[in-house]
Amino acid sequence: MGGSGNWIKSLITNKKNITDDQEKNIKKKWKLWRTSSEGLISSSKGFKSRGGSYGTPSLGSDPPSFSADDSFTAAVAAVIRAPPKDFFLVKREWAATRIQAAFRAFLARQALRALKAVVRIQAIFRGRQVRKQADVTLRCMQALVRVQARVRAHCNRGPSDGQELEKPSDQQKDDPAKQAEKGWCDSPGSINEVRTKLQMRQEGAIKRERAMVYALTHQPRTCPSPAKASKQGSVKKNNGSCKSSPGWNWLDRWVADRPWEGRLMEGPTNSSENARKSESSVSEHDTVQVRKNNLTTRVLARPPPMSSSATSSESSSTSQSPVPFSGSFLEEGGYYRKPSYMSLTQSIKAKQRRSGSSSSCSKTPFEKKQSMSYNGDVNVRRSAGSDPLNNQWTDLYPPAQVTGRHMWAKSQRG
């Protein structure tokens, strides 16, 4: 029984030794903020534990454990001997770092809040802008849809004068020129604006007609043969078939491509049509107006058979002579006249009077009868194919008589 009791005692003593070693190891851990009282307590405990065995080492202690205890005691003694001022400085530094960390955290939180606020404001503002843009685009699209609906309804309704609706089909689509010729106008505006536009179109058509008449009067006048005259008349009648012919200029083609303005100008263009009719009648009779001694006369391009050679040479000489195209050379009837520097002087007029009087005295009865018949034919042609304005001028200024001697002299010169 004695052996069993010793075993129990040894087990209990070993447990106590193990717990003491663990406590020592825990206390040996380094603490930065160990107070002075704790250091003193630990040192006093160490000295007390050592005081009983001072000078008489225990039997169970080993040399390495003794050396470890000596190093620990030396470190504790150094800590105790250190002045208390160093600990205050360390505490201040530690407090400063803590304060700086807290202040920096506060600044970071404040900046984060400001950033969140800015982002929120930007999101709100951009959202408003996006909503405004979406609203504007939606309004524009609605306006376009309304305009398209109105245009379609207007096209389906057709003209407002009670006519039948025209069915839209590709085969029955009218030409835009014909639509404009009918008078259809879908331009927006009031009645006054439409009337002003129509008036402007009429004025433009009048100006174009005047320009056309001016261009026709400035063309060089020739003496064509009857076959050529009939061909030119047929070309003028057939507008659409021979626009590429040399008789058509750019103005004729341009005016012929605008039938609507021609119909609009049926009323106010009677004067221009009368002028053109008078010109066509003059061209049909193949007459040429010649100015001699400030007297306007018309000479037939086809003279009587007795004096055909003389008159043909005279007409060819007058038609082939170049005439400068300027507005100052036109008379009221639209024919050419010579400029002032080409008119005869007084001396030449006097010579012509003397030669005319001498020739009239020495004229034979046959020549007198021939000149009378020729002048009568000229007067008949003048009364048949001239306008009243030219008749007034011819009444004021009678035509000069052409004698057989003058005609024979001119034929000899030619």
Curated annotation (Swiss-Prot):
Motif (Nuclear localization signal 2): 336-343
GO annotation terms (biological process): regulation of cytokinesis, site selection
Bias type Low complexity, positions: 307-328
CDD domains, sorted: IQCD
Biased composition (Polar residues): 231-244
Entry GO terms, CC: nuclear envelope; phragmoplast; preprophase band
Molecular function via GO: calmodulin binding
Subunit comment: Binds to multiple calmodulin (CaM) in the presence of Ca(2+) and CaM-like proteins.
Protein name in the entry: Protein IQ-DOMAIN 8
Coiled-coil residue windows: none
Annotated stretches, region: Disordered: 40-61, 156-190, 218-244, 262-329, 347-398
Motif (Nuclear localization signal 1): 14-21
Taxonomic superkingdom: Eukaryota
Family, per entry: Belongs to the IQD family.
Primary subcellular site in the record, as a coarse category: nucleus
Domain IQ span(s) in chain numbering: 92-120, 121-143, 144-169
Compartment annotation: Nucleus; Cytoplasm, Cytoskeleton; Nucleus envelope
Keyword Nucleus found: yes
Keyword Repeat set for record: yes
